[in-house]
Amino acid sequence: TDHLTHKLKHHPGQIEAAAIMEHILDGSSYVKEAKKLHEMDPLQKPKQDRYALRTSPQWLGPHIEVIRASTKSIEREINSVNDNPLIDVSRNKALHGGNFQGTPIGVSMDNTRLAIAAIGKLMFAQFSELVNDFYNNGLPSNLSGSRNPSLDYGFKGAEIAMASYCSELQFLANPVTNHVESAEQHNQDVNSLGLISSRKTAEAVDILKLMSTTYLVALCQAIDLRHLEENLKSTVKKTVSHVAKKTLTIGANGELHPSRFCEKDLLKVVDREHVFAYIDDPCSATYPLMQKVRQVLVEHALNNGESEKNGSTSIFQKIGAFEEELKAVLPKEVESARDGVESGNPSIPNRIKECRSYPLYKFVREELGTGLLTGEKVRSPGEDFDKVFTAMCEGKIIDPLLDCLSAWNGAPLPIC
């Protein structure tokens, strides 16, 4: 996001939302990596994010303003003077007005509930992108963390629950104050319905907490999967490079072989291919890694011209040896890398530690004792959701949330 975009729109809520996002994302190692990815392969991800991400300041801004206005209105109401009667001692009068009419409460709660529903809708839209492998830039479908994704439902159940939460939240967004009925023989022919609206808003808050809990656990899962992905990709690159040097560099008679020039293009394949598209069986002929690796070797062979007719300089003759060696080595190396991550000894540290949102991740993972969810473990996603939801209801999440903003001076980043 660029602050100029929001400055030109003038809305204070949008400017505030964008400024907080800018602060959190400033210096993020994930953002830096995304820029590198775009430079390396501009077509690997969309030039523009989808609306749930790209327009989130514009979406949240008006609702921030609504919640703030509702808060001010309720503060005025609870600090004001009720009546029926009001006794004005200075004038010796008993005033029978209508300050008991709690319309500020009813209207404020209706507006707040509408804002809560909109926040929940945005959360669900982002969650749906996160668990969908068509949109999440290489993460596994349903954020499945198992060695065999076919036996791991991942966050499929959580997405169904999120859809249910979101539907109920949208239903609760309907206003209460337009359902007023006359009472007390038409003496109370209009009423605020503030209590009903407040109760429904409390229900909406609880549902938003459930959605926030589910989304937060899913984000931590995605972070850990990115960490796993980075370690696995590094291992695959090293292994492919090692096998290429071993099998493609030297010919049968000890001379340098033309196939040695394939290594650079082989590593490009590893860089550009999503790890989780093949890692559960990296040497399978039906998965993209082996297919594209072979394609590179075949293309080099086709460009080898007349040299292909000579067995000692033929690249085609090297393909079998390369693939056999890779099949013998790669699965073991991949399993070793995965074991290293699971045991807490990864070759590459988790990038989240360099981000301003790390206090929230640390709270969920370390203080609450949650972890990477896989179908191989006996712990269900619901157990982790319960831990986070309980902590949220007890207000324990406020401190780590504020820690994420501890260095923020309350102003947007300068336009440069």
Curated annotation (Swiss-Prot):
This is Phenylalanine ammonia-lyase. One of its GO terms (biological process) is cinnamic acid biosynthetic process. The gene is PAL. Pathway: Phenylpropanoid metabolism; trans-cinnamate biosynthesis; trans-cinnamate from L-phenylalanine: step 1/1. It comes from Vitis vinifera (Grape). Its EC number is 4.3.1.24. This is a key enzyme of plant metabolism catalyzing the first reaction in the biosynthesis from L-phenylalanine of a wide variety of natural products based on the phenylpropane skeleton. It comes from the Eukaryota. It holds the Pfam family Lyase_aromatic.
